[in-house]
Amino acid sequence: MCELLGMSANVPTDIVFSFTGLMQRGGRTGPHRDGWGIAFYEGRGLRLFQDPAASCESEVANLVQRYPIKSEVVIGHIRQANVGKVCLSNTHPFVRELWGRNWCFAHNGQLADFTPIKSFYRPVGDTDSEAAFCDLLNRVRAAFPEPVDVEALLPDLVAACAEYRSKGVFNCLLSDGDWLFCYCSTKLAQITRRAPFGPARLKDVDVIVDFQAETTPNDVVTVIATEPLTENETWTRYEPGQWSLWRRGECVSQGKTE
């Protein structure tokens, strides 16, 4: 299985701390050696870093850790390959344009007997994850030829994710840069940090950060991960079928499918 990392914040925030913890699981404290990627939204633009190498040994990952890019929405992923060979084209997150915005997607899990819709969006690589992403966007494009608010889109997103979940394991993160959507099939956890901030210690490497010194009293930052990244904070675990929608660090909608 792979691992996911997402962030939604009300101010541009760097994710170096959480990213540093996740990267250790890419071959050092975890088995996810088959590539990694992370996407940072900057307005309507997107910075995407990917490498099919193990993240714990990747010079590109080292660059990202040394370069604290600030963003309000981030999606990251480390891969343990199930479907598709280890190569750059199979490395998450995947990105496509829809309605003049960059949509970004990362998936943890595996789908069986999945036949995607063949339409406008087509995979570049050969993973079931990218096929599901293209299938999802084709559904959205067919149902809504013109842009709509995410609140109008939510029922279609949730229904599609529930359908994918019925074919295997489908934990995912999805964003267009304004919002962050999360769906849990088996494993996801979240933490929202707000004032009063305190110190946090990573599980996978001996690193501590004092968020009090790094933030302002008005900052709200939510981090979503497959497994909790810190050992001294209380994370909330999702239940199977649970989904949530985040904007500016706050949960604006949530629910659960059967």
Language model region names:
Residues P52-V64, I78-G100, I117-S119:
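Short acidic (Asp/Glu) patches
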Residues D113-T115, F120-A143:
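Glycine-rich phosphate-binding loop plus the immediately following alpha-helix
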Residues D128, T186-V209:
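Gly/Ser/Thr-rich active-site loops/lids in small-molecule metabolic enzymes
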Residues I38, G109, A132:
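Residue-level signal for inorganic ion chemistry
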Residues M1-E59, A200, G241-W243, G249-E258:
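Extreme N-terminus nucleophile/cap motif
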Residues C2, W103-D113:
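Conserved beta-strand-loop-short alpha-helix elements that form
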Residues P199-Q242:
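A conserved acidic, glycine/proline-rich C-terminal tail/linker
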Residues V73, E146-T186:
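Catalytic core of PPM/PP2C metal-dependent serine/threonine phosphatase domains
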